Amino acid sequence: MGNTDKLMNQIFELKFTSKSLQRQARKCEKEERSEKLKVKKAIEKGNMDGARIYAENAIRKRSEQMNYLRLSSRLDAVVARLDTQAKMATITKSMTNIVKSLESSLTTGNLQKMSETMDSFEKQFVNMEVQAEFMDNAMAGSTSLSTPEGEVNSLMQQVADDYGLEVSVGLPQPAGHAIPTKTEEKVEEDDLTRRLAELKARG
């Protein structure tokens, strides 16, 4: 029983740590919003270098927030596994008592007592299956985030768009992401229609 108490204390400590990580994540989210506002003000003043620094800070805070959340999630998964282990230990003890009761029922030939014992036996097995399934579905894993130049530019452009500011000058656009104009779309559509007509004519 002492081991079970120790395990429950560990579970409590891990849950507390997970909550602390979630609080840190919320703090980073708040700081990210603050940095974005600084990006806006810097853009309004034409201070693009300052805006870039604030954008980098915002992205770094977002990265920290995600890392805190991932670590919290992994701790929750560990807690789930330990919680299952603690419950399984309790169930194992119950199973031992049930087996003893079953042996006693078999010895005395008490069918009613044997039936009641088997009901308890089956119920414990169902509990074990449910706990095992929950443990198998526990979350785990972590990935890392980077803050490339393109992401900084993207965040600055996003803030500018949100507040209706002009910042396209001096912000390099990522290759391969140009938005086609209506005229370009119309030309492509007409060209496709023409080629389909030619194919039908050949057929």
Swiss-Prot record:
GO terms for biological process: autophagy; embryo development ending in seed dormancy; embryonic axis specification; endosome transport via multivesicular body sorting pathway; protein transport; seedling development; vacuolar transport. One of its GO terms (cellular component) is nucleus. The keyword Metal-binding does not apply. Residues 13-51, 109-140 form a coiled coil. It is a peripheral membrane protein. Disruption phenotype: No visible phenotype under normal growth conditions, but double mutants chmp1a and chmp1b show embryo development defect. Keywords: Autophagy, Coiled coil, Cytoplasm, Endosome, Membrane, Protein transport, Transport. Pfam families: Snf7. It is found in: Cytoplasm; Endosome membrane. It comes from the Eukaryota. Belongs to the SNF7 family. PANTHER family: CHARGED MULTIVESICULAR BODY PROTEIN (PTHR10476). Interacts with SKD1/VPS4 and LIP5. Interacts with CHMP1B. Interacts with VPS2.2. Involved in ESCRT-dependent multivesicular body (MVB) formation and sorting of endosomal cargo proteins into MVBs. Mediates the MVB sorting of the auxin carriers PIN1, PIN2 and AUX1. Required for embryonic axis establishment and seedling growth. Required for autophagic degradation of plastid proteins. Promotes the efficient sequestration of cargo from plastids into autophagosomes. Mediates the efficient delivery of autophagic plastid bodies to the vacuole, but not into the cytoplasm. This is ESCRT-related protein CHMP1A. It comes from Arabidopsis thaliana (Mouse-ear cress). The lineage of its organism: Eukaryota, Viridiplantae, Streptophyta, Embryophyta, Tracheophyta.
